[in-house]
């Protein structure tokens, strides 16, 4: 009898406290709980890890060495486990060749469609090129009215310069009598002299006929002869009518442009047969940008106007100085002339070189002064050459700071060679199809009319493409295009794309584990996602969804609530059952919010701001429709709108990149816009995202917030440390001296197991304490440095209550809801939400200038409603300090607490990019046509009740 439940016994991974849980199979199961409660530890690090490990174990040891080996999770046993597929948010491809089309494999089917039924056209004149047999040509000619006089001719030259003496002589020897040169018939016995500098059209007259059925055989022979003379091209001159051009190959009869046999690889931008030769199929390339090389044109060369690596020191006898002095002397300026006042030809010489013209360079050293003549290649050309030649990633990154991305001038961003782009299906080429939104692409396929032969060939291909496009639309991604780069997708979008791909595979009996699939999805599209999840369940799969979204919880068959708190306060199963059961569970924080017993309140009154604002004029990046947007300062501002409406384009691509360049001195190229007014009201911009605070276990909340420096100073000031002569660096695990050298301060040692997963074991010498014995002998209030790092923030607050400097920083960590996190917890073990809150606490602990703008993109990702409550309080504290906070968000609990909302839409993709509503939440809720307003209105009404 098949197992009805997945049974987990004794799960102890991370903070899980010997958890036992039964999960029904073939159901939609939601794992919920506070951020850091242990949901992901149970779902991904225990259940998925064991499912994956068991599958890998079934392979041979030879095959296993090529796969990422998975350590056995800390669990007694798991029963009823199916093969597991994880769809998380961390595997977004950053490969510039990866697109929505390639990730979903729709583009593979599309290439096959164009290769099988595509109609090639001449890249020069756009004429349709079709391959015809001799019989096809004969049938076509005999369709002319009977009695029509025709000449069968072989074009041996079309628009070519030359005298063609050999060709004409050869035709005469072969017995041909007439030739037509530039439209005039000549007898080959005549002397024909051509101007070799002019382009000529030459056709040999092979036969002259009168159309009637009896000439079929003779016509076929003449056609074969003519095409043999002219590489498969034939011209039939209809006397007193139009000429007809035919080709036996895929070649333009007029221009002779030949197209090879259509194959799927011709339409792949990852294959040299299809990729544009200029950009190698990338659609863009890096090019030196004069505006990034000289960002501040008010500076002179001596003041360091040039920021390019190797050219940023025009003083002190450097090579750069010698070249700049040579150019200055030649073009009539000095090294002290502001860059904006340098003559245009001087600027051109600095950027693009002297075009072979030599400069006089003077070299001064201790032996005297010498001069020599040399040409200058120009800074732009120098950067371009070094970029191509270097093999160092560091050098490439350094040079890229002075380069911007430009669209390929040959393929104009289409990635393919021109011959491939001249093949159409339904009147459009493959790039035009890939640039249609998914909704428009489905409409195009529905209206596509094909011949019976094409229908027979393409029926299955079109069905596969349409099914996959429909799956993408069903998960709320109808606004995306197949040409969209994977690197530009949000984590939620890329996760839903992989979800749609899984639906397309139609596997059954699989355990799917998903990580917040609703992230980045507007409430309007939530029902589509839920239907997709239900469909996956209904065909016979088990779904475990780690989720905080209330709609998803209500739609679930079963909920597992992990908690009750986070970190050391979590790791238990609070309750399990239906949404109703969770709501009735008094211990469940989730149940309290789900039932409405707890709510995030709406502020009693909205802030009016400081009267200043940022005005973005003419925003037209991606799908933005040349809009003007005003964002008030000194307020909590939410940017809302359905997925793909243009929120990230407006804030991340235009506003943030412009602000970070002007205020922070970064080298970013802002998205297309006319101007931004009001930047002088700010002094810095900070983007707080969910990226890790560090990539190694050496990074932790203490090192990131800077409190570790204060703690080390405190230990160095103890009597014992002073007696031993220990300074603060003695208490660092990153440098030699105080750390344990056996593990170099890591506390753990890696043991390579080759065919098995590598094992990390506590260091034999320090037993995981990271420091040597002498360092650990120094104590403050009975605790050594290791004991302090092992304390939670909550414990640390009490321990350091008499040290204001340390207490203040720990207090802000506690205030953002991280009281349960260890002071020295490795950054690699923090969730995205936790990392974000560490960053927020660091900002809160800084002295406020009141002129900072904070930008956050979906900060509620991974956060439980209780965590969202804390996050909102922190963000409002930043605004209370006089700063401005701009948040891109779909979470209505955050949106309802905003002072000001800017709602974009009305739809996603091409149908978005406009401002639909702006104002307070109450004003937006009253705006017809705003999807955000519709859901906000309901929530505001519920809250008032």
Question: What is the predicted function of each stretch?
Answer:
Residues 1-945:
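Conserved phosphate-binding elements of NTP-dependent enzyme cores
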């Amino acid at each position: 009898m098949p197992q009805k439940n997945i049974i987990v016994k004794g799960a102890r991974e991370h903070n899980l406290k010997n958890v036992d849980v039964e999960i029904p199979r073939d159901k939609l199961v939601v794992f919920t709980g506070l951020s850091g409660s242990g949901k992901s530890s149970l779902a991904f690090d225990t259940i998925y890890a064991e499912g994956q490990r068991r599958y890998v174990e079934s392979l041979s040891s030879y095959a296993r060495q090529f796969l990422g080996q998975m350590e056995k999770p800390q669990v007694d046993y798991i029963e009823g486990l199916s093969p597991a597929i994880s769809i998380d948010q961390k595997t977004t491809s950053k490969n510039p060749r990866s697109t929505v089309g390639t990730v979903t494999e729709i583009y593979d089917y599309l290439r096959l469609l164009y290769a099988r039924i595509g109609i090639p056209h001449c890249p020069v004149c756009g004429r349709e090129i079709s391959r015809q047999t001799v019989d096809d040509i004969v049938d076509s000619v005999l369709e002319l009215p009977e009695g029509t006089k025709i000449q069968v001719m072989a074009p041996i030259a079309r628009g070519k310069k030359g005298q063609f003496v050999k060709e004409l002589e050869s035709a005469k020897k072969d017995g041909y009598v007439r030739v037509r040169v530039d439209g005039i018939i000549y007898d080959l016995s005549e002397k024909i002299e051509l101007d070799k500098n002019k382009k000529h059209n030459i056709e040999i007259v092979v036969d002259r006929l009168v159309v009637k059925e009896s000439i079929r055989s003779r016509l076929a022979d003449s056609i074969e002869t003519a095409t043999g003379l002219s590489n498969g091209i034939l011209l039939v001159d209809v006397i007193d009518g139009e000429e007809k051009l035919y080709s036996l190959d895929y070649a333009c009869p007029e221009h002779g442009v030949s197209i090879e046999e259509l194959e799927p690889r011709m339409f792949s931008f990852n294959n040299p047969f299809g990729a544009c030769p200029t950009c190698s199929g990338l659609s863009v390339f890096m090019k030196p940008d004069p505006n990034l090389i000289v960002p501040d044109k008010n500076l002179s060369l001596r003041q360091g106007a040039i920021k390019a690596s190797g050219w940023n020191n025009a003083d002190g006898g450097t090579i750069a100085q010698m070249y700049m002095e040579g150019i200055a002397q030649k073009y009539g300026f000095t090294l002290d002339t502001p860059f904006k006042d340098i003559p245009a030809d001087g600027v051109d010489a600095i950027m693009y070189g002297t075009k072979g013209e030599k400069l006089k360079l003077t070299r001064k050293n201790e032996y005297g002064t010498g001069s020599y003549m040399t040409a200058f290649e120009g800074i732009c050309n120098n950067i371009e050459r070094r970029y191509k030649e270097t093999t160092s990633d560091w050098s490439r990154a350094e040079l890229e700071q002075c380069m911007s991305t430009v669209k390929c001038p040959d393929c104009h961003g289409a990635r393919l060679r021109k011959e491939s782009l001249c093949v159409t299906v339904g009147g459009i080429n493959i790039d035009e199809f890939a640039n249609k939104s998914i909704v428009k692409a489905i409409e195009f396929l529905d209206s596509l009319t094909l011949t019976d032969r094409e229908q027979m060939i393409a029926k299955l291909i079109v069905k596969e493409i349409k099914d996959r496009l429909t799956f993408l639309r069903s998960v709320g991604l109808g606004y995306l295009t197949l040409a969209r780069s994977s690197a530009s997708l949000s984590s939620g979008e890329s996760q839903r794309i992989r979800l749609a791909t899984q639906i397309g595979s139609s596997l059954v009996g699989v355990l799917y584990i998903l990580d917040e699939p609703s992230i980045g999805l507007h409430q309007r599209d939530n029902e589509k996602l839920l239907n997709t999840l239900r469909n996956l369940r209904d065909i016979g799969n088990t779904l475990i969804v780690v989720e905080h979204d209330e709609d998803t919880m209500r739609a679930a068959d079963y909920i597992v609530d992990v908690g009750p708190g986070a970190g050391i306060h979590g790791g238990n199963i609070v309750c399990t059952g239906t949404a109703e059961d969770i709501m009735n569970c008094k211990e469940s924080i989730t149940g309290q919010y789900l039932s409405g017993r707890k709510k995030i309140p709406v502020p009693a009154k909205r802030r009016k701001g400081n009267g200043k604002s940022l005005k973005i004029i003419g925003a037209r990046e991606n799908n933005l429709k040349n809009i003007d947007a005003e964002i008030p300062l000194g307020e909590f501002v939410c940017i809302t709108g359905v997925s793909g409406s243009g929120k990230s384009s407006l804030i991340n691509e235009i506003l943030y990149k412009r602000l970070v360049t002007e205020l922070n001195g970064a080298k970013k190229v802002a998205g297309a816009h006319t101007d931004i007014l009001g930047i002088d009201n700010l002094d810095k911009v900070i983007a707080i995202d969910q990226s890790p605070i560090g990539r190694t276990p050496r990074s932790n909340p203490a090192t990131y917030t800077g409190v570790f420096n204060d703690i080390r100073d405190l230990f160095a000031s103890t009597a014992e440390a002073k007696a031993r002569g220990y300074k603060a660096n003695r208490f660092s695990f990153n440098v030699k001296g105080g750390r344990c050298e056996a593990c170099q301060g890591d506390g753990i040692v890696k043991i390579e197991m080759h065919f098995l997963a590598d094992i990390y074991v506590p260091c034999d010498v320090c037993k995981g304490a990271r420091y040597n014995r002498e360092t650990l002998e120094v104590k403050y209030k009975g605790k050594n440095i290791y004991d302090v790092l092992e304390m939670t923030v909550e414990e640390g607050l009490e321990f350091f209550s008499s040290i204001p400097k340390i207490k203040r920083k720990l207090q802000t960590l506690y205030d953002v809801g991280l009281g349960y996190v260890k002071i020295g917890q490795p950054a690699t073990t923090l969730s995205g939400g936790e990392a974000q809150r560490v960053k927020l606490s660091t900002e809160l602990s800084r002295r406020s200038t009141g002129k900072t703008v904070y930008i956050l993109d979906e900060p509620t990702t991974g956060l439980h409603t209780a965590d969202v409550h804390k996050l909102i309080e922190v963000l409002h504290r930043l605004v209370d300090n006089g700063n401005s906070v701009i948040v891109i968000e779909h979470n209505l609990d955050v949106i309802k607490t905003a002072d000001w909302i800017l709602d974009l839409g009305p739809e996603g993709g091409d149908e978005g990019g406009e401002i639909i509503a702006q104002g307070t939440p109450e004003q937006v809720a009253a705006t017809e046509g705003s999807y955000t307003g519709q859901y906000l209105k309901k929530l505001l009404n519920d809250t008032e009740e």
